Regions:
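Membrane-proximal basic amphipathic "stem/tether" segments
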Residues: 1-30, 35
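Cell-envelope/extracellular polymer assembly enzymes that use nucleotide-activated donors
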Residues: 36-41, 68
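Alpha-helix N-cap/loop-to-helix initiation residues
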Residues: 48-49, 100
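Aromatic/hydrophobic pocket-lining residues that form the small-molecule binding cavity
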Residues: 52
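Short, acidic, metal-binding catalytic loop of nucleotide-sugar glycosyltransferases
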Residues: 55-67, 85
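Active-site-proximal specificity loops/subdomain of glycosyltransferases
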Residues: 72-115
């Protein structure tokens, strides 16, 4: 019981430190220099929405700037997306519920010649 409480406290402390570091980052990335567009493609689901803004902010604050960052969601999930996850520079796109494939298949169909991460 004490060990579990300690683990929760330690996790919360680590999470708070990481969150503060991500939120304090200066967003001034440099161009990637690739011949083809660089696209970051990802998906999520409602259980992960509470922390999604941190993931997105971290992706948008990388040292190399992608041409596009696309978050693929189902229509139902997009309706539940919190405002904290709607960040400048992020494209929110709707696709069928292809589970984990919804992060790559729609991007391949939309920008087949891009470098996709």
């Amino acid at each position: 019981m004490i060990a579990a409480a300690f683990r929760r406290w330690k996790h919360a402390r680590r999470f708070a430190r990481a969150s503060a570091e991500i939120m304090a980052r200066d967003i001034a990335p440099r161009p990637h220099g690739l011949a083809a567009p660089l696209v970051v493609s990802l998906t999520s689901y409602p259980a992960r929405f509470p922390n999604l803004h941190l993931v997105l902010r971290s992706l948008l604050a990388q040292t190399l700037r992608p041409d596009r960052v696309i978050l693929w969601l189902t229509r139902d999930d997009a309706a539940r997306l919190p405002d904290s996850a709607r960040l400048p520079g992020l494209e929110i796109a709707i696709c069928p519920d292809w589970r984990s494939y919804k992060k790559i298949v729609p991007t391949l169909l939309e920008v087949p010649d891009a470098n996709i991460v």
